């Protein structure tokens, strides 16, 4: 975990004044490494001793030592792009880094994933009267993918990327409904409120999120993904891939739990979709001509 990621992970545990320092640094880490302690205190509207207390809470000896660690973190990645990519990387270099990072992260998540949580989630999903998938930002795309998969399972499925419709759906939940909320940071206020609304209306809430987050704490069941990617600083890449893969795991578990007869229904759905596609054999014949 680099210094930027460490600051982000500790935000909730900082005092109000120390958090002001953290937010100034996260907003402009490049400026922070060139700032004096007096300038930092002035910008954060705190005292210089507060800046030093913040630095010590980050396991550094003071502001100069903190700036050194911060500079090293910035050298290890390009903010708002990817933690593994540097400004001067060639196309061959950054292409390889992105693929290697994705494969390594998925392998790490595979080994760290709580299989009992997966099993419990499959239990809840297979018993659900209605399933809703919600996310915001990049996680909305993952929720949409989940809707596409579970829509084939002959169970009522709800999806929306509009927060008003999401809130209305959670307010209309009832016993037997399951709401799946997806957020890498687990700190999106709207999603935490959705979890509260759904539970107040007797629904079960499954969260795909990071451990120890407000969303994880509010959910009935949290499937925590250990992905070392700070999406406040970098573009979400591997975290989204991990979420998509876990959705595939849940869909597979759902299918297996429902049994062979249920898979016959999936076969009929696949057959019905064939008419919407060009026939591969006809396309091959056309190519031969």
Curated annotation (Swiss-Prot):
SIS domain sequence ranges: 121-260
Sorted UniProt keywords: DNA-binding, Repressor, Transcription, Transcription regulation
Protein name: HTH-type transcriptional regulator HexR
DNA-binding region, residues: 37-56
Gene3D superfamilies: Glucose-6-phosphate isomerase like protein, domain 1, Winged helix-like DNA-binding domain superfamily/Winged helix DNA-binding domain
Any one Gene Ontology molecular-function term assigned to this protein's record: DNA binding
Domain of life: Bacteria
Annotated ranges, domain HTH rpiR-type: 1-77
Role played: Represses the expression of the hex regulon (zwf, eda, glp and gap).
A Pfam family matched in the record: HTH_6
GO annotation terms (biological process): carbohydrate derivative metabolic process; DNA damage response; regulation of DNA-templated transcription
